[in-house]
């Protein structure tokens, strides 16, 4: 009686010729990152352990790095990218999308990159939001573990044809979405199909 479980399911229909996926990804394609609004829906157990249990921070306490309370930072609503993705598919050659959830950026991107290719992602193209830095520092969490647990500031990724890179970035920027070129797709061998370098 004191607990509620809220869930939702979305169902859609797509023409087979319009279906996006790994089979469309080619060497030379460009990986575009779309900024997250915060933790989104993953990593809260670790965030609570580090910030509330280990560091004993108050949810109501103002945090200088965030410019607001810890509670406000942790409760920032998840950005929904559906309209942004639809805008991209309407005007560019999108090969596929990747929603960055549990498993992190590389773990999720591997699902949409076919065998024989690798998405090479440049860590130097963005700075994770302060909440991720704080969790890592105060919890003494290794970078690899952070990158497997959290979105690290990237909530959605689009893989687009190289000639559409500038157009895709312009479309997302016009929609007031933080975005940037994260990397490219190259021929690969057996091993990870996405890697941060």
Question: How should each PLM-predicted stretch be described?
Answer:
Residues 21, 52, 111-112:
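N-terminal low-complexity, intrinsically disordered patches enriched in charged
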Residues 11, 46, 50, 168-171:
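Short alpha-helical scaffold segments that flank and stabilize functional sites
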Residues 1-4, 58, 64-75, 79-197:
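Glycine-/charge-enriched secondary-structure boundary and capping motifs
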Residues 1-45, 184:
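Glycine-rich anion-binding loops of enzyme active sites
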Residues 17, 26, 40-43, 48, ...:
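Basic, gly/Ser/Thr/Pro-rich low-complexity segments located predominantly at protein N termini
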Residues 25-72:
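Acidic, glycine-rich loop-and-beta core segments that form the ion-binding/anion-interacting portion
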């Amino acid at each position: 009686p004191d607990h509620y479980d809220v869930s939702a399911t979305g169902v859609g229909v797509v023409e087979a010729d319009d279906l996006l996926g790994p089979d469309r990804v080619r060497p030379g394609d460009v990986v575009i990152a779309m900024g997250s609004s915060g933790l989104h829906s993953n990593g809260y157990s670790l965030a609570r352990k580090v910030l509330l249990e280990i560091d004993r921070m108050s949810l109501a306490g103002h945090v200088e790095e965030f410019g607001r309370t810890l509670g406000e930072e942790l409760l920032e609503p998840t950005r929904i990218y559906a309209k942004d993705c639809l805008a991209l598919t309407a005007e560019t050659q999108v090969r596929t999308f990747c929603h960055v959830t549990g498993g992190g950026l590389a773990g999720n991107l591997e699902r949409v990159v076919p065998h024989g290719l690798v998405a090479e992602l440049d860590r130097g193209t963005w700075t994770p939001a302060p909440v991720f830095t704080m969790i890592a520092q105060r919890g003494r969490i290794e970078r690899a573990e952070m990158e497997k647990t959290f979105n690290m500031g990237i909530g959605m990724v689009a893989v687009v044809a190289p000639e559409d890179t500038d157009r895709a970035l312009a479309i997302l920027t016009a929609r007031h979405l933080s975005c940037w070129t994260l990397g490219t797709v190259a021929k690969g061998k057996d091993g990870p199909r996405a890697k941060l370098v």
